[in-house]
Curated annotation (Swiss-Prot):
Domain of life where this protein originates: Eukaryota
Organism: Loxosceles laeta
Cofactor: Mg(2+)
The protein's name in its UniProt record: Dermonecrotic toxin
Keyword Disulfide bond: yes
Amino acid sequence: MVNAVKQIPTFLNDGANAIEADITFKGAVPTYSYHGTPCDFGRDCIRWEYFNVFLQTLRDYTTPGNSKYREKFILFVLDLKTGSLNNHEVRKAGENVAKGLLENYWNNGNNGGRAYVVLSLPDIAHYEFIRTFKEVLKTKGHENLLDKVGYDLSGPYWPSLPSLDSVHEAFKKAGVDGHVWLSDGLTNWAALDDMARLKQIVERRDSENGFISKVYYWSVDKYSTTRTALEVGVDGIMTNYPYVIIDVLNEAKYKDKYRLATYDDNPWETFKN
């Protein structure tokens, strides 16, 4: 939802504890935080920043002692637009994103940003991205930073979404056991569906053979949709209007059950009510 650095403080001031950015590629090189048209209704689709600059700015907002530091800003999602990449480019993209984060966000392990990171990929066939990403951090001597990283494999959406068993197999191929965030959703101008897929994901998360740590839903901009998503049992909500989520969380029905996550909460641990 946030692709320009000037938008970051606006979302944080409205109550967000996390942000999502769309990362576009030139070949295998992550180049811009940019979505383009069409996008959610009411959203500025053409805001952008250079990838490295965006990461450096995120580091400022999540590094204690920095003048821009925000204690409540604890996580960001990189929506990686790898849909058009071939298998070789996907592997190289994983390498390049790892190097970009290591240098520009984690500051090569020297007092870098402390936020958790979720890497979201649009195709379960792109599991090699994750394998390469992890291997780069290990080779560079920063395997410990993988403790801060989660993964989302959620597509492709056309012609139909993959089964959850297929998603699970992709994570196994990626070498991922835990740290799994799984998303579902619709653009905010689409007619609201019955959330059947979302309910299926939540049920799988809570099952004995569940492989999912957290479930998040997008794009939730209405009070009514927020309430419905909470009733289904999501762990996170992606919105263009953070204050809407804050307002609902403060309602009598929800305030004793839900709250915004803090840095001390484990983003890879499934919440048990």
